[in-house]
């Protein structure tokens, strides 16, 4: 018990140090017009009050640093490294979904079973600039498919927006990160097409598999403001066990992800998605959405409030359904540092005769420095 208390105190001290020191020390650093270094350092502490589980709190501190070298407007070399202390509540809670979707300590070690630690991405990109509004780019290396697929202006960043896994990306969409692959980005005026192909080292069953994803997007400018409308389809090779654990099946899914400004103060978003259940899956559908409220409403232009809800329909395993509600207030202290107060309500409903059903509230405080 004393060891656990010491761990909690140490984690709180790390977060306090993050709040107290970073406004002075975190500086954007552009070495020259071709080479730049940036990153994000975050600390979060979450405490759960949950039925059918222990009330407890945990923290984590992830740190990511990235380097970009662009010798000219057509060529770019990029690398990102990730480090973390602690796994937060993610490996402690009985909920199916992670309360914080960040890359934490276990996530940055032996990535995808490749025996690779800390190196998240490293890639080269070449862009054909066919006209002022027409570009075609090709990327190859160790990539993150979520950099190209399932974007959302208001619900896509676990360090500055929602924390819960279901409000960052769709859990049904099985979009992989940090492995070998290539990406295509084609943009003509307001239309865009993106495609991703990846070879992933291993899934939960230890099988290597191929991932294929494509996204069609359109950006609409109207008197309300800018809106982004996307349709994503993805599929894997036949390397995922079925419910009985006997045969291997594909994963196949489709997602729509929309975000729209509603004037200068408000914004709204949705993410709906479905996947087949030939393979064993926790969820076969997600229906999520929310609103963003700019701090301009109370004369703090850089602050914002985010409110989001997700309903996930259970697949062919034990879960009947999961509901998530999350709200946060993000207080921007300066151009580098922001604090977020976060509250989540989660409820897992299981099929008859399954595990006791957890439901409850998770309170969180997150500090994020971007440089």
Language model: regions and residue ranges:
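Transmembrane beta-barrel domains of outer membrane proteins
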Residues: 66-68, 125-127, 183-187, 217-219, ...
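Detector for outer-membrane/organellar transmembrane beta-barrel domains
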Residues: 32, 42, 188-193, 214, ...
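Surface-exposed coil loops of outer-membrane beta-barrel proteins
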Residues: 92-123, 131-215
